[in-house]
Amino acid sequence: MELPYTNLEMAFILLAFVIFSLFTLASIYTTPDDSNEEEEHEKKGREKKRKKSEKKKNCSEEEHRIEAVEL
């Protein structure tokens, strides 16, 4: 009974299977840095909120100054 593939073809098929298996196992057993990315995202969000609140405070202080000068 003859094999459907030559030895060279079988070697490439086996090599592809091994590489695919290694990448699959690596993706399962490595821990991603999602926690670091989430922390950075939260920090950026906090900074944006702080800047917005500072702008609001500055605007309200200026309005109070203008009102005081007008009175």
From Swiss-Prot:
<dbReference type="GO" id="GO:0016020">
    <property type="term" value="C:membrane"/>
</dbReference>
<keyword id="KW-0472">Membrane</keyword>
<keyword id="KW-0325">Glycoprotein</keyword>
<feature type="transmembrane region" description="Helical">
    <location>
        <begin position="8"/>
        <end position="28"/>
    </location>
</feature>
<protein>
    <recommendedName>
        <fullName>Small integral membrane protein 31</fullName>
    </recommendedName>
</protein>
<feature type="compositionally biased region" description="Basic and acidic residues">
    <location>
        <begin position="56"/>
        <end position="71"/>
    </location>
</feature>
<keyword id="KW-0812">Transmembrane</keyword>
<feature type="glycosylation site" description="N-linked (GlcNAc...) asparagine">
    <location>
        <position position="58"/>
    </location>
</feature>
<feature type="compositionally biased region" description="Basic residues">
    <location>
        <begin position="46"/>
        <end position="55"/>
    </location>
</feature>
<keyword id="KW-1133">Transmembrane helix</keyword>
<feature type="region of interest" description="Disordered">
    <location>
        <begin position="31"/>
        <end position="71"/>
    </location>
</feature>
